[in-house]
Amino acid sequence: MLEKEILHFIKQFETAKDCFLHGCCYWFAMILKYRFSRWESCKIMYHVIDNHFATLIGGNLYDVSGEISQDGFMAWDKVLDYDCLEYDRIVRDCILMEER
């Protein structure tokens, strides 16, 4: 039931899919997190190699394309502990999208 609800919600963003897959994936992950925040396990995840954000909800991982593999993802709140310089770069370039 939850998976159907999530996929139905994601489908509403079909026209913005390209944007959320190429540069704004953090913001779509936040949309999903806030929309499905009633689930305690709902959290933002990050793939260090692919530089991609997604949301873990009810044990499954989602981005704007639907359910995706969890391989290579780590909890976003753990990235700072993993590599503080990488964390700062991600915030600057991918979340805030600051000009250099």
Which residue stretches match the model-derived regions?
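A structural boundary/capping signal
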Residues: 1-100
